[in-house]
Amino acid sequence: MVLIRVIANLLILQLSYAQKSSELVIGGDECDINEHRFLAFLYAGGYYCGGTLINQEWVLSAAHCDKRIIRIYLGMHTRSVPNDDEEIRYPKEKFICPNKKKNVITHKDIMLIRLNRPVKNSEHIAPLSLPSNPPSVGSVCRIMGWGSITTPDETSPNVPHCANINLFNNTVCREAYNGLPAKTLCAGVLQGGIDTCGGDSGGPLICNGQFQGILSWGGIPCAQPRKPAFYTKVFDYLPWIQSIIAGNKTATCPP
């Protein structure tokens, strides 16, 4: 994926963290066409991020995926050949935590998008439910996206790729990156070789069938040994998400 370019006063932060806003899944295989009905393809002059449909009118992605104009594809599999039920939507409203530190991209990296028109369930479109419980360390988790399938040179696939990774104790990411933002999950494969990558940002981390994370950051090159990616922890933001959807547009994210 194309890496997000951060303004000059964030260059020091980039030495410690590498943003994966346009990354693909490394070490995965083509997703089954029926396993990603909730997966959104975010386009702004080119594919740059993923997202997750959580009901007929709302998509969750990463805050760093926000752009002025976004086209959202749902029901897509092969980029060059649209499905019959593929839909295009635009944001009607976008919500980012009002207490997010604007100069720290990793802080509260979550964005809720209200679509300009609801979508209907179809053969290739259906929402993914929000988690009912937090994930457990050791869980097997599914990653997916149209991000780069090679690293460091990037190769963008025509179809989404999927792979399985493991959920780690957050100390693994703290040791790898000299820190870890709050309300974050750490996931990957310790020996390397499987990972999200450029273009996968904003896409889901699905652990034991539940939508638990939103891809935020990871190492560059992707898929290095002992360099897991980290994901915004969806469960910790449930009160904010549910309040916004219920109409409380001034809801504040947890500290």
From Swiss-Prot:
Cited Pfam families: Trypsin (PF00089)
Start and end residues of each Peptidase S1 domain: 25-246
GO biological process, one term: proteolysis
InterPro entries, sorted: Peptidase_S1_PA, Peptidase_S1_PA_chymotrypsin, Peptidase_S1A, Trypsin_dom, TRYPSIN_HIS, TRYPSIN_SER
Residues of the signal peptide: 1-18
Glycosylation sites (chain numbering): N169, N248
UniProt keyword annotation of Kinase present: no
Lineage: Eukaryota, Metazoa, Chordata, Craniata, Vertebrata
Tissue expression as described in the entry: Expressed by the venom gland.
Keyword Signal: yes
Membership in a protein family: Belongs to the peptidase S1 family. Snake venom subfamily.
GO molecular function: serine-type endopeptidase activity; toxin activity
Top-level EC class as recorded in UniProt: hydrolase
UniProt-recorded name of the protein: Snake venom serine protease HS112
Subcellular location: Secreted
Native organism: Bothrops jararaca (Jararaca)
